[in-house]
């Protein structure tokens, strides 16, 4: 399946299609959207965002704890969309506060 991903970035919202077997960060980059990242392996917080609608599968990541995931935080480099999803990007500072 392919889902609509809406990213709320500091420069405004962007919307693109993302297959359910492709990481959101990778799909965003393929379509020309520049997002923060570092390790690309789910092991840091550079690419952190916050899911405000929809669901993702980020079981490949290991950096976030259960409370952070429950609060909606997501690592876009290891997140697959499970539905149409809205994510606020650039949330590393909020995550590590």
Curated annotation (Swiss-Prot):
Record keywords, A-Z: 2Fe-2S, Chloroplast, Electron transport, Iron, Iron-sulfur, Metal-binding, Plastid, Transport
Amino-acid biosynthesis keyword on record: no
Binding locations of [2Fe-2S] cluster: 39, 44, 47, 77
Principal localisation: plastid
Source superkingdom: Eukaryota
GO BP terms: electron transport chain; ferredoxin metabolic process
Cofactor note: Binds 1 [2Fe-2S] cluster.
Cofactor(s) this protein cannot do without: [2Fe-2S] cluster
GO molecular function: 2 iron, 2 sulfur cluster binding; electron transfer activity; ferrous iron binding
InterPro entries the UniProt entry points to: 2Fe-2S_ferredoxin-like_sf, 2Fe-2S_ferredoxin-type, 2Fe2S_fd_BS, Beta-grasp_dom_sf, Fd_pln
CDD domains membership: fer2
One Gene Ontology cellular component: chloroplast
Pfam family, one: Fer2
Keyword check for Acyltransferase: no
Family: Belongs to the 2Fe2S plant-type ferredoxin family.
Free-text function comment from the UniProt entry: Ferredoxins are iron-sulfur proteins that transfer electrons in a wide variety of metabolic reactions.
Protein name per Swiss-Prot or TrEMBL: Ferredoxin
Organism: Alkekengi officinarum var. franchetii (Japanese lantern)
């Amino acid at each position: 399946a392919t889902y609509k991903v809406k990213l709320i970035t500091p420069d405004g919202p962007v919307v693109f299609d993302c297959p359910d077997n492709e990481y959101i960060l990778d799909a965003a980059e393929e379509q020309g959207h520049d997002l923060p990242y570092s390790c690309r392996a789910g092991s840091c917080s550079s690419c952190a965002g916050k899911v405000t609608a929809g669901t993702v599968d980020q079981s490949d990541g290991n950096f976030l704890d259960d409370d952070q995931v429950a609060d909606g935080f997501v690592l876009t480099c290891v997140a697959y969309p499970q539905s149409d999803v809205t994510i606020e990007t650039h949330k590393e500072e909020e995550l590590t506060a």
